[in-house]
């Protein structure tokens, strides 16, 4: 699994189901394949399968989650 950081969190109203929905709908990754999700105040972290990481990064960068444009990167 690869942990990805998303530039929106609880302050923007992001919930785990929003992240799962965005990844499943925009990137074609099945929800059951998505790992742990951690929502912080201004960012969120999600684990995705290593083979899907590039697809998630390119598929969601600049897209909106809960009406907020997001940036994604591999978390350190």
Residue positions per predicted region:
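Terminal-proximal interaction/regulatory segments of ATP-powered molecular machines
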Residues: 1-76
């Amino acid at each position: 699994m690869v942990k990805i950081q998303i530039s929106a969190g609880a302050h923007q109203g992001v919930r785990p189901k929003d992240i799962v929905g965005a990844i499943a709908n925009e990137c074609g990754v099945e929800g059951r394949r998505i790992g742990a999700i951690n929502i912080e105040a201004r960012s969120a972290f999600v684990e995705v399968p290593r083979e899907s990481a590039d697809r998630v990064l390119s598929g969601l960068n600049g897209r909106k989650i809960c009406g907020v444009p997001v940036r994604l990167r591999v978390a350190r």
